[in-house]
């Protein structure tokens, strides 16, 4: 099972929160104290809470569940995409479009348009168009790919969303709440833990911290998926003795 140690978290700077004047009082139970005007997060809480979240994600993946990685702020977007791709899951790394979950029917139409344009760009359709029309379609394709590229093969709503930056992604969290989709999220000292099923109190700005979260979640998802494949192989290879 994928687990993260106290040492891993200390080295990644997970314990460094925001300046004390920006704190959210709802995070008080997870704060150890303050140093030089910066809140220090109590890793005695974070370590078991993160490991519990990893076990949950691994379990979802072991049942062929879909994990949606969400992180659209600059510090998180690259790591979010890399981690999701590495474990064959899904991501939103550019901008959360309102209704991405709650208005899935409409989003599905946009994904269909994206796939149609992708086909046209490959099969030579673009070459038969006027320069202006080809340019317009290329721009539309790029725009759709940026917004929906990470979910174009998701084929339905996710079974869990994993969020870096609860404050920044509050719309995604609210949509998941409305649909009863579990939320796993990194919550810094300036954010609210409301609406989050698996809270990970921690630094949501430092690259090393973000990489620790994303890579650990990707590893947990892969472990769960491999467990599912192993069970499948065992079932397929099982022959009843006569």
Curated annotation (Swiss-Prot):
The keyword Ribosomal protein applies. GO terms for molecular function: structural constituent of ribosome. Gene3D superfamilies: Glucose-6-phosphate isomerase like protein, domain 1, Helix hairpin bin. GO terms for biological process: translation. InterPro entries: Ribosomal_uS2 (IPR001865), Ribosomal_uS2_bac/mit/plastid (IPR005706), Ribosomal_uS2_CS (IPR018130), Ribosomal_uS2_flav_dom_sf (IPR023591). One of its GO terms (cellular component) is cytosolic small ribosomal subunit. Keywords: Ribonucleoprotein, Ribosomal protein. The keyword Glycosyltransferase does not apply. Belongs to the universal ribosomal protein uS2 family. This is Small ribosomal subunit protein uS2.
